[in-house]
Design a protein with these regions (language model features):
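Active-site entrance/lid segments in N-terminal catalytic domains of soluble metabolic enzymes
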Residues: 1-207, 237-240, 343
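Alpha/beta catalytic cores of nucleotide-metabolism and tRNA/nucleoside-modifying enzymes
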Residues: 1-21, 95, 163, 185-210, ...
Length: 354
């Protein structure tokens, strides 16, 4: 057995400030997921059935990012959601799985001239993922960007890069409603996972998407500094006007549903194969790797994205980084203690004014 390594996530570290001549307002946060897919902001909305359908994808695209339409829909309904976005001349992505019938979904989606197709599985370092990636590469045009995941190791990054994907999705278990690390005991803390994937790619011009675990705008800066080209966000966007589902009133407060794609509800709706399980008539036969619950109603997505982008720009100002490439130029992380983490949070105040 190899020595047990230490692995870190966003809350374990801080970026140390550098000499700067750059103001936050002067920073440029555009990025790309391939030669043909440029984004004005490094934000992607997650392919979750309580996060991204056409309303979310339209809103994110208008703000400069891209949304990925989830695959817990029949093919016709997923295409309908895509067309709603494309009818406004906006960029859109769509998710497919690695199951035996998913190539039919991929064929249908690619006919819609989507900008991004995502092979969305819980474990991207597998034979099944390799098989569908190879098939999609033969079908897709050069204008459609191919992303596959999820992974968290050097070897997995090398594996997917050899298949010729444009982008790789990193993250096994960091999401707020994901229980893979508890149920399966599998995963790598997200910051270390991003660094491992970037190391595995070497000098290859393959983009990384950090998927999961973003709680604050500062986490985006840490993810990009560690090697990501964009972040995928779920929980922060759940509960907004644009997320699927109705507003629920409970005890005088307003909520919307939010669930992991590994929850029983989501798996029963169609995402079971994402976790390499079969659809069951009896829900108790699932081994869920996610939970389902409620999140507070948050209003329009635009306000949230504005704060996230503002925080990222502020971070880049502290680091003297004009753009994301500069942000990744020899960043200096410091590992912090539990006391350092608590010091970073709001403290010594009885009530925060909202």
């Amino acid at each position: 057995m190899d020595p047990i390594k230490e692995a870190l996530t966003y809350d374990d570290v801080l970026l140390t400030p550098k000499y700067s001549e750059i103001l936050p307002s002067e920073t440029v946060i555009k990025t790309k997921l391939s030669k043909n897919l440029n984004l004005k902001i490094p934000i992607i909305s997650s392919a979750m059935d309580t996060v991204t359908e056409s309303s979310m994808a339209i809103a994110i695209a208008k703000l400069g990012g891209i949304g990925v339409i989830h695959r817990n829909l029949d093919i016709k309904r997923q295409i309908l959601e895509i067309r709603k976005v494309k009818s406004k001349n906006l960029k859109v992505g769509a998710a497919v799985g690695a199951g035996p019938l998913e190539i039919k979904r991929a064929e249908a989606l690619l006919k819609e001239k989507i900008d991004l197709i995502v092979v969305d599985t819980a474990h991207g370092h597998t034979k099944k993922v390799a098989e569908i990636v190879k098939k999609i590469k033969k079908l897709k045009s050069k204008k459609t960007t191919l992303c596959a995941g999820n992974i968290s190791t050097i070897d997995a990054a090398k594996f997917l890069s050899k298949l010729g994907v444009d982008a790789i999705k990193v993250g096994i278990g960091p999401g707020s409603i994901c229980t893979t690390r508890l149920v399966a005991g599998i995963g790598v803390p997200q910051l270390s996972a991003i660094m491992a994937a970037r190391k595995g790619l070497g000098k290859k011009k393959i983009m990384l998407v950090a998927d999961g675990g973003i709680k604050f705008s500062g986490d985006i800066s840490k993810a990009l500094a560690a090697g990501a080209d964009a972040v995928m966000i779920g929980s922060l966007f759940a509960g907004t006007n644009e997320s699927p589902g109705k507003i629920i009133k409970k005890n005088g407060k307003y909520f919307k549903s939010f669930r992991g794609m590994g929850s029983v509800g989501a798996m029963n709706k169609g995402s079971a194969d994402r976790y390499f399980q079969k659809k069951q008539k009896d829900p108790s036969k699932y081994v869920p790797e996610g939970v389902e619950g409620l999140v507070k109603y948050k209003g329009p997505i635009e306000k949230i994205v504005y704060q996230l982008i503002g925080g990222l720009k502020s971070s880049m100002g502290y680091l003297g980084s004009k753009n994301i490439k500069d942000l990744r130029n020899k960043p200096k992380f410091v590992k912090i203690t539990k006391a350092g983490f608590y010091e970073s949070m709001v403290h010594s105040i009885d009530e925060v004014k909202k």
